[in-house]
């Protein structure tokens, strides 16, 4: 079926790489396809073990810190919800965008971006590690659901459009323009699957659904990281109205976000400080009124940033369903600057805290220790699926990739138990 105004996606978008046999366990008279292909894909991600493991993986602070932790899983749920709301305004398939939000961090290792850094060091001589490329690897091979005619895993066997919607960086390390970028979306090992997904797509251009997911991710973590910082009393939003403090934040932001000038960031800080919902938070004291004010702040900022992208994109692209490569997401520069200010607040007052940096250093050391132990003792030190892959790996690079895949799959609790067993100490001694 070709695309139409009623259904802007076509059979090419809905194609799966491996043909699947019909289900056989249904009761007589109940056969039928009641869900769309993208709804089925969303369900596959939602029920995956890889998604559940995100409950014990760090977003900014550890999943066991505080009474209301934000984990990679809760963050992914928030991204999915924001993306779904944007999809309504743009005419994208709701299940497709929600799926992209759920899966956008599914390849994250223990300790989030800090764990990414450590695994990239471990695999530096053999293709490195990148969370976005690991997302794709999990969805197309590591998460068990479907096997091909040769008995090889096809991962969740998602549709082409679903896999593309999860792909923020549609290039491989060292390919074309991607060679000048730190982030990439595919490992060379997964080139064949990547070529299949990107067949007919404009080179190095993410589809609209992936762009929506990417902006929803930016909005979610910038707003919610600041919310967590306020609750933990690490961030005081009154700094936005203090010229000297705001100027220092703007200078830091100019260094971190080279595409946004200090003047733009100062102007953004002033705009944010003058919003009634920001002023209402004031000095947070955890009372009912303060908690309500903070929740209203997060709600209104998410709405501000998401609706600006919808309206600007609609103004540029016109009416009708906007899907795949029919449009690019348009976000006003002043809104990007406001989101950048929130990111700088989290960077300055949470991620640059000396205690946080010390914890991160210990986490990286732990990953290096466990990687050395697993590789030197493989295949006996590996889980059965990974041990089999290690035994059939063609060379040292492929064997190291298997070890990295296993570590990336660990929850933080499991990684710490393995490290504690190796050192012969209690887990508490490692904190």
Swiss-Prot record:
GO MF annotations, alphabetized: dGTPase activity
SMART domains: HDc
Modified residue annotations for N-acetylserine: 2
GO CC annotations on file: plasma membrane
Ranges for region Disordered: 1-36
Superkingdom of this protein's organism: Bacteria
Composition bias, Basic and acidic residues: 1-20
GO biological process: dGTP catabolic process
Alphabetical list of PROSITE patterns matching this protein: HD
Keywords in alphabetical order: Acetylation, Hydrolase
UniProt domain HD: residue ranges: 72-222
CDD domains named in the record: HDc
Family label: Belongs to the dGTPase family. Type 2 subfamily.
Name assigned to this protein: Deoxyguanosinetriphosphate triphosphohydrolase-like protein
Taxonomic source organism: Mycobacterium tuberculosis (strain ATCC 25618 / H37Rv)
């Amino acid at each position: 079926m070709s695309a139409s105004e009623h259904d802007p996606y076509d059979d090419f978008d809905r194609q799966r790489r491996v043909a699947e046999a019909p289900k056989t366990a249904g009761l007589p008279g109940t056969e039928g396809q009641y869900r769309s292909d993208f709804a089925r894909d969303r369900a596959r991600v939602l029920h995956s073990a890889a998604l559940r493991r995100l409950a014990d993986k760090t977003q900014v602070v550890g999943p066991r810190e505080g009474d209301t932790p934000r984990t990679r899983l809760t963050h992914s749920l928030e991204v999915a919800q924001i993306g779904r709301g944007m999809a309504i305004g743009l005419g994208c398939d709701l299940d497709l965008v929600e799926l992209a939000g759920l899966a956008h961090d599914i390849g994250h290792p223990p300790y989030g971006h800090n764990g990414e850094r450590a695994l990239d060091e471990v695999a530096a001589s053999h293709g490195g590690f990148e969370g976005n490329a690991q997302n794709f690897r999990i969805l197309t091979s590591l998460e068990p659901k479907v096997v091909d005619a040769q008995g090889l895993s096809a991962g969740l066997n998602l549709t082409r459009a679903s896999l593309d919607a999860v792909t923020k960086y549609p290039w491989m390390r060292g390919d074309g323009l991607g060679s000048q970028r730190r982030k990439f979306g595919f490992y060379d090992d997964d080139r064949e699957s990547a070529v299949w997904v990107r067949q007919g797509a404009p080179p190095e251009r993410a589809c609209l659904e992936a762009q929506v997911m990417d902006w929803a991710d930016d909005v979610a973590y910038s707003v919610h990281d600041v919310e967590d910082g306020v609750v933990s009393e690490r961030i005081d939003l009154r700094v936005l109205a203090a010229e000297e403090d705001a100027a220092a934040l703007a200078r830091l932001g100019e260094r971190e976000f080279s595409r946004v000038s200090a003047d733009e960031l100062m102007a953004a800080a002033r705009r944010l400080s003058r919003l009634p919902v920001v002023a209402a938070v004031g000095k947070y004291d955890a009372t009912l009124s303060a908690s309500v004010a903070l929740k209203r702040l997060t709600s209104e900022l998410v709405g501000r940033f998401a609706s600006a992208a919808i309206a600007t994109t609609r103004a540029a692209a016109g009416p009708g369903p906007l899907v795949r490569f029919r449009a690019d997401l348009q976000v006003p520069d002043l809104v990007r600057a406001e989101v950048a200010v929130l990111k700088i607040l989290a960077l300055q007052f949470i991620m640059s805290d000396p205690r946080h940096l010390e914890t991160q250093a210990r986490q990286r050391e732990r990953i290096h220790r466990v990687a050395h132990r697993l590789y030197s003792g493989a295949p006996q030190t590996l889980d059965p699926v990974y041990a089999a892959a290690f035994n059939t790996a063609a060379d040292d690079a492929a064997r190291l990739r298997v070890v990295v895949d296993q570590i990336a799959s660990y929850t933080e609790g499991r990684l710490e138990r393995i490290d504690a067993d190796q050192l012969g100490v209690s887990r508490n001694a490692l904190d």
